[in-house]
């Protein structure tokens, strides 16, 4: 039987659900996360599983979009910066290495024009704003 839990303050705005973990984004732009954390995908600066919602280690109230895949999490802040954390085999965090990150870090690509991001089981794809002319 499903269990009801007390949500953090605010209305749910966006969420991402994986097989073993969950991230909610609430109005006010805070990220709350819980579930399996073996690869640091909760962003809590450790690998301890959580049965109750906690905010990411980076905290803050300026998250615009959240997504994830496999065992990593991706998010864009309202200033357009791209943040990513968790499992990093294959270099899927975009940090120019394969080191697991237990807290949110910016990608190697940097920049502040990120518009959308999504993660797969072993990859990440993101759209960065560019000026172009179609023909």
How does the language model describe each region?
Residues 33, 72-75, 84, 123-126:
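Conserved core positions of repeat-based scaffolds
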Residues 118-132:
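Blade-level signature of beta-propeller repeat domains, shared across WD40, Kelch, NHL, RCC1
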Residues 32-51, 86-102:
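Short glycine/serine- and acidic-residue-enriched loop/turn motifs that recur at repeat junctions
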Residues 30, 36-39, 59-60, 79-81, ...:
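Acidic glycine-/aspartate-rich tracts in secreted/extracellular proteins
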Residues 48, 52-54, 58, 62-71, ...:
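Thr-biased low-complexity repeat/linker tracts and other Thr-enriched repetitive architectures
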Residues 1-28, 129-135:
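Enriched but not universal
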């Amino acid at each position: 039987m499903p269990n009801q839990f007390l949500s953090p303050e605010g209305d749910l705005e966006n969420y991402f659900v994986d097989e073993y973990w969950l991230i909610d984004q609430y109005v006010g732009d805070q990220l709350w996360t819980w579930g399996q954390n073996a690869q640091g995908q909760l962003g809590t600066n450790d690998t301890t599983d959580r049965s109750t919602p906690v905010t990411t280690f980076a905290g803050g109230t300026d998250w615009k979009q959240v997504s994830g895949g496999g065992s990593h999490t991706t998010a864009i802040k309202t200033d357009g910066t791209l943040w990513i954390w968790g499992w990093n085999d294959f270099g899927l965090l975009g940090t120019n290495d394969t080191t697991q990150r237990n807290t949110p870090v910016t990608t190697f690509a940097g920049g502040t024009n990120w518009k959308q991001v999504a993660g797969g089981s072993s990859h990440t794809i993101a759209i960065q704003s560019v000026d172009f002319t179609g023909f």
